[in-house]
Amino acid sequence: MSKVVYEGWMVRYGRRKIGRSYIHMRYFVLEPRLLAYYKKKPQDYQVPIKTMLIDGNCRVEDRGLKTHHGHMVYVLSVYNKKEKSHRITMAAFNIQEALMWKEKIESVIDQHQESQVPNGQQYVSFEYKSGMDTGRTASSSDHESQFSAAEDEEDSRRSLMRRTTIGNGPPESVLDWTKEFDAELANQNSDNQAFSRKHWRLLQCQNGLRIFEELLEVDYLPRSCSRAMKAVGVVEATCEEIFELLMSMDGTRYEWDCSFQFGSLVEEVDGHTAVLYHRLLLDWFPMIVWPRDLCYVRYWRRNDDGSYVVLFRSREHENCGPQPGCVRAHLESGGYNISPLKPRNGRPRTQVQHLIQIDLKGWGAGYLPAFQQHCLLQMLNSVAGLREWFSQTDERGVHTRIPVMVNMASSSLSLTKSGKSLHKSAFSLDQTNSVNRNSLLMDEDSDDDDEFQIAESEQEPETSKPETDVKRPEEEPAHNIDLSCFSGNLKRNENENARNCWRISDGNNFKVRGKNFGQEKRKIPAGKHLMDLVAVDWFKDSKRIDHVARRKGCAAQVAAEKGLFSMVVNVQVPGSTHYSMVFYFVMKELVPGSLLQRFVDGDDEFRNSRLKLIPLVPKGSWIVRQSVGSTPCLLGKAVDCNYIRGPTYLEIDVDIGSSTVANGVLGLVIGVITSLVVEMAFLVQANTAEEQPERLIGAVRVSHIELSSAIVPNLESE
């Protein structure tokens, strides 16, 4: 193998013949004359899945941002202009990685072009500008492309417009306010230092932001349309990190944008342009003022100086009509300008400008100045939210997601549909993302390709290898086991608002150790469970309840009759009345040599050093959430655990009362247990690279448990 210029995990992106897109992880290797990718990191002389010869005729086409099942990826296409049918399309979950690959590939292409100059075979040099000076034209090189060979002239013009990160340029209806501002900057001189005061005045300083108002009066806008206002602030993060966060409309947005209630993708026009639906949360006398929503086109580009521009303007769309219970506001102009500043004390700094000119419509917008002012300031304060989010967050590798607006794109949507149904769909966002995270994708290049989970591969690409290199029976899906024969006295209910019930938690709600955790200290979403949770019992008695797996007719006994292995976790709650919540996890068989098998058949010392619990409290008072926390805990080190190894099961009796600290937390929890929703994940801690990544034994969510629903079990020995 020749010298490697650059290598690493990237996403393969494309569309199948039926038009459905696909993405999956592949290991890309760039050499001085070759670009290739493999299913996994190549060893020795492994044959790649696909290769492309790199020479001076090759080009890197930036296709911008694409959405697949709510996951946004940044797409590059590498091709030879003499043979356009042969190309490699690659993508990354973050724009930094995509730009790094683009730079590396273009540097290799440039070296080949320079080497051809002495021979008289000169290639056109493509040093692309941002397109700021030429309007809709990407660069002067695009004009030179018109003189290429006749057979590829049309395709060349079409693709060269996409080779920079500006796409086709903003739609004609979208006002590029950043372009006008830059032009004014270029024209200013030392005698006109107050040029900015001609158009903007400082209105106030709030939350560390400077709030400006445009001075220009316009006659063509309605009275209810505000003057343009902008907020300017500094965020300690890179332009790329801020840009990726701005482009997302998932649950993370609630943490920094106080005016955001719900957002969704209506149409993806191209890699730089999309139509979005956005419902605002303005919280101004909601009993008398209806909520506002928007349908707008969003365009973005990256400039040569590393800055980003995101532009908004309202538009009508056939799949995004007016919604019952909402007033459709009109966004005359708006967006973000994200510009890099010099680092300070080793920390990146970025100036963020957020501009809004909006007509809120409705009866109150033109006659209640306080309403207009309140709403504008609330939206502009998102810049302060960005600043605080980055200052308080260590994890920067968040995946941006935009849920596809299924309901609005459907022809079955009726304007007479109640506002309640739309409200319900808006708050099913987390459920939608949960399904998206669990979707499995396959490669069109191989019918027997290995599956992987997006959420894991985004964080740590190599974490998919232990799950894909070896097919384990313990990873078989749940539908291979008939779950209908198992039952417990606590009922299962998938309804979000159900009470006194349980359901299986999404494994991706929990972070576990990824591959090479010892070196990189990186955690990943847990993904699929190793075992199936088939039943939950809720018991009470005057004494502590031990060894429940011996009870005739319990789920562990039913599993044994069917030749299945079960793990029983008995969480014992002390008090004047002793309670036990018992979870029954089932699988077909233990895999010899696996970490789970070594845990089941190991001694108590090994088990105590490895059994781990990850708690979550999605619903509950602040003090309970703080007391319980979400930090993983080695159960055997924190409380007393009694292990009972039966022929076809392992029971773990967890005595919460054996720990003073746990007892204190329990005192808080028991008093408000009916108002709590608690999630618990059980796993075996993986300490070495061979054991990693960690896998959940199982996870459960219990909701609003009633103490009175517990029953006294019959534990008479057979």
Curated annotation (Swiss-Prot):
Give an example GO cellular component term for this record: endosome membrane
Highest taxon, organism lineage: Eukaryota
START domain ranges (all copies): 180-392
Tell me what topology the record assigns in the membrane.
Single-pass membrane protein
What residues form the membrane-spanning segments? 664-684
Give the disulfide map. none
Signal peptide: which range, if any?
A: none
Q: Which GO terms describe its molecular function?
A: phosphatidylinositol-4-phosphate binding
Annotated segments matching region Disordered? 134-174, 437-483
Comment, domains: The pleckstrin homology domain (3-110) binds to phosphatidylinositol-4-phosphate (PtdIns(4)P).
Protein name, UniProt field? Protein ENHANCED DISEASE RESISTANCE 2
Q: Which organism is it from?
A: Arabidopsis thaliana (Mouse-ear cress)
Q: What is the lineage of its organism?
A: Eukaryota, Viridiplantae, Streptophyta, Embryophyta, Tracheophyta
